[in-house]
């Protein structure tokens, strides 16, 4: 298990996770503490040689700590299939614990 992320109210929290949408799976935020707000989500494509497809990139989640709190920031790889989505168990990088202090 990774050490907790400790921040103060008003500070940003940035989590970067490998993501490869070409597989049909996407990294999705599935749980976060109430004192944290999701401010931005972006995707940074990976470096690929000409002609390469399916190269993983990075999904970047930016949060702002709004109030003292603690709890998990949980992400899952989800493939939105029919009739039920396929949800993979989180890796250690996708299962973080955050402590926000005043």
Name these PLM-found stretches.
Residues 1-102:
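Extracytoplasmic soluble-region selector
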């Amino acid at each position: 298990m990774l050490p907790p992320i400790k921040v103060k109210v008003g500070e940003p929290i940035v989590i970067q996770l490998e993501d490869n949408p070409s597989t049909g799976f996407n990294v999705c935020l599935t749980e976060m503490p109430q004192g944290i707000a999701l401010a931005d989500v972006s995707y940074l494509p990976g470096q690929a040689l000409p002609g390469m497809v399916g190269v993983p990139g990075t999904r970047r989640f930016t949060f702002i700590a709004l109030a003292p709190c603690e709890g998990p920031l949980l992400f899952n790889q989800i493939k939105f299939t029919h009739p039920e989505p396929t949800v993979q168990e989180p890796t250690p990088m996708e299962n973080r614990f955050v402590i926000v202090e005043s």
